[in-house]
């Protein structure tokens, strides 16, 4: 979808603008490169960031298609991003998942997703047409890496973020722990 791709490109542009001059930022198109190509391109990376996108294919977390508000699935992209998570876990490379990226990390570690959450705290079903994310607070867990990284901007262990999720973690993946959550538990 062109509108959605435009949103993703704006996010990418902001990430690149924020990059330090010493960073070597490589865009990985997991849909094109698949599992083998994604893992090869990650070799030598200092860190990996997996951005947002369409729904993770339910086959990766033991569920079925046909759920409410089902988005498009990019199975090959899923495989590429799952390979990036595997690479990061094997090599100790720092890994950050944003939106769908967090969901990919969770499924890579055996977790599951709630396929469609009710409208509310952080759902905007019109994101592809109005390009508006929902602003809401999240509570950051004490003692987490995230708390240490965000310490200068946290107010009473909270920060305001933007999101537009319609899915969330149902069962947390093995060895993962929650670093932050929205008021509804997401």
Model-derived features with residue positions:
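The feature captures the ABC ATPase H-loop/switch
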Residues: 102
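N-terminal beta1-alpha1 cap of cysteine-dependent amidohydrolase-like domains
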Residues: 1-96, 106-107, 111-114, 118-160, ...
């Amino acid at each position: 979808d062109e509108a959605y791709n435009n949103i993703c490109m704006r996010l990418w542009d902001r990430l690149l603008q924020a990059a330090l001059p010493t960073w070597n930022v490589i865009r990985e198109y997991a849909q094109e490169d698949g599992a083998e190509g994604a893992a090869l391109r990650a070799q030598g990376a200092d860190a990996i960031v997996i951005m947002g996108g369409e729904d993770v294919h339910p086959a990766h977390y033991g569920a079925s298609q046909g759920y409410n508000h089902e988005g498009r699935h990019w199975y090959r992209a899923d495989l590429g991003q799952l390979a990036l998570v595997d690479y990061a876990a094997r090599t100790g490379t720092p890994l950050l998942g944003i939106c769908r990226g967090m969901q990919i990390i969770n499924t890579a570690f055996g977790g599951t997703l709630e396929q469609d959450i009710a409208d509310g705290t952080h759902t905007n079903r019109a994101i592809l047409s109005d390009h508006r994310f929902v602003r809401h607070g999240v509570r950051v867990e004490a003692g987490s890496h995230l708390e240490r990284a965000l310490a200068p901007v946290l107010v009473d262990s909270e920060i305001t973020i933007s999101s537009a999720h319609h899915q969330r973690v149902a069962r947390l993946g093995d060895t993962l722990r929650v670093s932050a959550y929205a008021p509804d538990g997401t």
